[in-house]
């Protein structure tokens, strides 16, 4: 069985979709459906089983071999996390993101099960250069980023002793289908689309930290491309480590808004004041250094913002 934690969430459900497209339906989704709206991400997917995240963790900790799943666990894609960068309950974040990840990690390395997990570019904090997979470049701005940084450090410490595949992927700004449940944490493309559909103009922040209006730049990566990187590592088990998962391109928010306007054929960008509560806690620029990922042989192209947002708009407004 293929286990996808966070499988009803944004990236997890897209990963299940790609697995289905490859003919794999022996997939177990682990999630927390307290937010019942997430079920819509699973409706059009074929899975073999569903299990609540707490039950799964309890069985992992007890050393359960999941004999009811034919052949046990083949691989764990660990996408489940509290991904709200605005969540400041550190105890909750550390339990869900750090302790849970450690439990899965030890279960996998003891049994030599491939473990591919979601890290985050939030580990880099507010820097404007050197987004390189090295602890000296990591300085997160929020407790979410810290929980991801700490787990990366934990994995790095164990790496020399591990005999099976362990891969951490530092996701940059991911956008695309199946993120509607994320509310304020959904991508800029999602929110701009909602604004235009309501008859409003798409709104971007005014300039701040030396960036012009709408000119803050991020490495925006389409969710399909993120899933392809995950699946490539699973098919190339000789590679382990922590890798950036971006495009290597920084594009301004302006490009996202223009792609949304182009799809709808209406609207003009409106600039709003930069919120005080985000000053000093906001990544104004991100750009993945792709040297390490390209160095292990990943050579697929990544969609530009214009290409990815066009695809996404077609899906959202279908």
Curated annotation (Swiss-Prot):
Q: Name one GO molecular function term.
A: ADP-glyceromanno-heptose 6-epimerase activity
InterPro entries per UniProt = Epimerase_deHydtase, Heptose_epim, NAD(P)-bd_dom_sf
State the Gene Ontology BP annotations.
ADP-L-glycero-beta-D-manno-heptose biosynthetic process; carbohydrate metabolic process
Q: What keywords are annotated for this sequence in UniProt?
A: Carbohydrate metabolism, Isomerase, NADP
Query: What is the reaction catalyzed?
Result: ADP-D-glycero-beta-D-manno-heptose = ADP-L-glycero-beta-D-manno-heptose
Q: What is its EC number?
A: 5.1.3.20
Keyword Transcription regulation in record: no
Broadest EC class assigned to this enzyme: isomerase
Keyword field contains NADP: yes
Coiled-coil ranges per UniProt: none
Residues that coordinate or bind substrate: 173, 184, 191, 205-208, 218, 282
Can you tell me which family this protein belongs to?
Belongs to the NAD(P)-dependent epimerase/dehydratase family. HldD subfamily.
Q: Domain comment?
A: Contains a large N-terminal NADP-binding domain, and a smaller C-terminal substrate-binding domain.
Q: What is this protein called?
A: ADP-L-glycero-D-manno-heptose-6-epimerase
User: Which source organism?
Assistant: Aeromonas hydrophila subsp. hydrophila (strain ATCC 7966 / DSM 30187 / BCRC 13018 / CCUG 14551 / JCM 1027 / KCTC 2358 / NCIMB 9240 / NCTC 8049)
């Amino acid at each position: 069985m293929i286990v996808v934690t966070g499988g009803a969430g944004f990236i997890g459900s897209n990963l299940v979709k790609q697995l289905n497209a490859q003919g794999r339906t022996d997939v177990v989704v682990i999630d927390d459906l307290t937010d019942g709206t997430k079920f819509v991400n699973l409706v059009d997917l074929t899975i073999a089983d569903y299990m609540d995240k707490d039950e799964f963790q309890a069985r992992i900790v007890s050393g359960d071999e999941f004999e009811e799943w034919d052949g046990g666990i083949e691989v764990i894609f660990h996408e489940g996390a509290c991904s709200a960068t605005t969540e400041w309950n550190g105890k909750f974040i550390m339990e869900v993101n750090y302790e849970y990840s450690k439990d899965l990690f030890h279960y996998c390395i003891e049994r030599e099960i491939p473990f591919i997990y979601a890290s985050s570019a939030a580990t880099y904090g507010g820097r404007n250069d050197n987004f390189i997979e090295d602890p000296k470049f990591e300085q997160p701005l929020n407790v979410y980023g810290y929980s991801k940084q700490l787990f990366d450090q934990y994995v790095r410490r164990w790496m020399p002793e591990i005999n099976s595949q362990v891969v951490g992927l530092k996701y940059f700004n991911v956008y695309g289908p199946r993120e509607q449940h994320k509310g304020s944490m959904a991508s800029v493309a999602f929110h701009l689309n909602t604004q235009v559909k309501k008859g409003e103009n798409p709104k971007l922040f005014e300039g701040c930290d030396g960036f012009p209006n709408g000119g803050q730049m991020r490495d925006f990566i389409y969710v399909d491309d993120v899933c392809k990187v995950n699946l490539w590592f699973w098919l190339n088990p000789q590679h382990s480590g922590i890798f950036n998962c971006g495009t290597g391109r920084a594009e301004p928010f302006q490009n996202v808004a223009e792609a949304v306007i182009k799809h709808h054929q209406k609207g003009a960008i409106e600039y709003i004041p930069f919120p005080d509560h985000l000053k000093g806690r906001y990544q104004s620029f991100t750009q993945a250094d792709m040297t390490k990922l390209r160095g292990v042989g990943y050579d697929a192209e990544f969609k530009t913002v214009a290409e990815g947002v066009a695809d996404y708009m077609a899906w959202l407004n279908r």
